[in-house]
Amino acid sequence: MLLKTMTALGVLAGVLCAQNTRPEAGPFNASHLDMQPPPAQGVAVRAGRLFDPKSGKNLVNQVILIQGDRIADVGPAERVAIPQGARVIDLSRATVLPGLIDRHVHLIQDAQVNDGRAALTGLNYALKDLSAGFTTLQDMGSAFSYATVELRDAINKGLVPGPRLQVAGPQINPRGANYYPAPSAAMPFGLNTGYNNWQNTGNVNSPWLARAAVRDRSHYGVDWIKIYETEDYEGGGYPGQGGGAFTPDGKMINVPSLTLEENQAIVDEAHRRGLKVACHAYGGEGLRNCLEAGVDLPIHIIVGVTGAAGLDDETIRLLKKPMADGKPRQVQQTLWDLIGDLEERDLKASGGRATRFQLSEKSFKRLVAEGLEEVFGSGAYTVGHGMQAFQFGYFVKWGMTPAQALRMATSNAAEGLNFDLGRQVGIVEKGRFADLVAVAGDPLTDITETERVKFVMKGGVVFRNELK
């Protein structure tokens, strides 16, 4: 019955568009769903090639044994015996990868009439991502209350199918931030559902109100806190026509949203409650504030803390400073919101001197050269879900090896997830969740294979199989 109901969502009609346009997937294709629970005897997957993020190589002729939702064993076919009665899935002509992880999506960005509609809208986008091979998603802030928390819990309870989720709930911005329509409207921590603005993010005007915002989100059960640290689309308003992010002489405008003290309060309160903090900052003082406050994941990083193109030594020093727990800080750069009409607008605003996309390329290359660990986050929102993998091609074009690009969405991405989820996904090994993806070709020789996922398994359940 579930399959029949979901089939009504539509037929997949995604078409990859040309460079500098935003590719968009059609409705989720529920006809791909298998949804058969693994038999008591387990499942055996024959993998012709198995990508190993640790070595960056393909292991050939492998067998993956699955019991319930976990990997029971994995290794060469001559060592791993297939139990009698096990369901055998033959992917001997394909490349199998760990389930992909997208550490930056927005499942609910449109105004919704109520929380129920918001959750169903988010489910539709989450299923597109799952069908494309992304078995774990991190929602980096979705407006209109805490519907993503309810969606996460419904998936975990098996009420609806979907990827694994970690969610941030409503983003944190100060009152009067540029995402509000003018005049600014005071709203209690994003709970005004249906209000016609891009995101309801609160009334944070002091360190104590910043702590209160974190406590509120913790009460509702989020996994992460998301800060909007720079009002990066200043100069016309995103996504309105005519907006720009540059001065006429080509300098990027990055207005800090919060003070250092407010950031420190957010990070301290979040860490006290076992939550991690992600910070949207394109550069300048806002990026510096985030890093000095100790955020777990800085996002975007288009220019340096001084506003320098290609970053500067001070930015690299702050990024390399170990976290409070002694671990190195990961970084994330998204391309989604930089591809499309923003190129033309940025060129116009900067007098033809720069675009955010061009600056992102320079910064990406510097971060990789400095040895900082990049994690994949597409930035997909109301368009783009299910089409994220095209971004891997840019990373390879910018100097990464295909193996490095794949690590961004597997082992690297897993490592920074909150709680213990990171130790259960991202690598195909004994004891981890049986989250698998397969493509017909070899992404180590053609990274665009990731755009043509043919097989998806999450927790031992097949959600898509075009390799039968």
What are these regions (language model features)?
Residues 4-15:
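Bacterial N-terminal signal peptides
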Residues 18, 23-25:
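Boundary at the C-terminal end of the N-terminal hydrophobic targeting segment
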Residues 31, 91-111, 116-251, 255-275, ...:
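Divalent-metal coordination cores built from histidine and acidic residues
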Residues 27-30, 35-41, 50, 56-97:
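Histidine-rich, glycine-flanked metal-binding segment
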Residues 291-298, 323-330, 371-373, 400:
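Glycine-enriched alpha-helix->loop->beta-strand junction motifs that scaffold or abut catalytic
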Residues 272, 356-443:
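His/Asp/Glu-enriched, well-ordered alpha-helical/loop segment
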Residues 111-114, 148-149, 179, 236-238, ...:
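Histidine/acidic-residue-rich catalytic or RNA/ligand-binding cores of hydrolases
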Residues 32-35, 50-63, 76-77, 401-406, ...:
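Acidic, glycine-enriched loop/beta-strand segments at the rims
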